Amino acid sequence: MTKKVLILSSSPRRGGNSDTLCNEFMRGAIESGNEAEKVFLRDKTIHYCTGCSTCSLHGKPCPQKDDAAEIIEKMVAADVIVMATPVYFYTMSAQMKTLIDRCCGLYTEMKNKEFYFIVTAAEDDRKLMERTVDTFQGFLDCLESPTIKGVVYGTCLLYTSPSPRDSTSSR
């Protein structure tokens, strides 16, 4: 059975460690006969949740005009969601956390999803990286019948220089 796979890459660097693993995951998903799409969060405008309760208490769409609604609709439509992040200060990137916070209005529609997590860090201590997975688990605890299918830990990965193709990189 063909599955719709949505890969959310929250690396701030195109071609960075977690983004590279996303590309490999996507290749494998397609080679296995699935549909796959990668959303590179860095290229999207996603505003912070303001806690206005328009979505949660009033059942109306978020009044913010950005790319979050489109991404969240893709999450609702997907069978499999891959959430990938570099680990900064022992947690997920701000880009990923901001998207998760914006899921408030439609999280009840994310039912029976399969999840994979990709976490990368310069650390070699997997236990420290598991803090990030625990944060993802907190999100899944709010969903109906999610299943964690796997976690990819990319450890001891160091960033040495910006990619020549990525002129917006900074140190």
Locations of the language-model features?
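Short, glycine-/small-residue-rich phosphate/pyrophosphate-handling segment
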Residues: K111-K149
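Short, proline-centered helix/strand-breaking motifs
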Residues: T85-P86, R165
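Short beta-strand elements in bilobed, periplasmic/extracellular small-molecule ligand-binding domains
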Residues: A36-K38, P146-Y153
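Short histidine/acidic/glycine/proline-rich micro-motifs that form metal-
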Residues: P12-G15, V87-Y90, A121-R126, L157-L158
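Single conserved hydrophobic/aromatic residue that forms the stacking wall/gate
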Residues: Y159-S170
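N-terminal beta1-alpha1-beta2 submodule of the flavodoxin-like/Rossmannoid cofactor-binding fold
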Residues: M1-A84, Y90-D101, G105-L106
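Short beta-strands and strand-loop turn motifs
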Residues: L8-S9, A84, F117-A121, V151-Y153
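Short beta->alpha junction loops
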Residues: L41-D43, Y153-L158
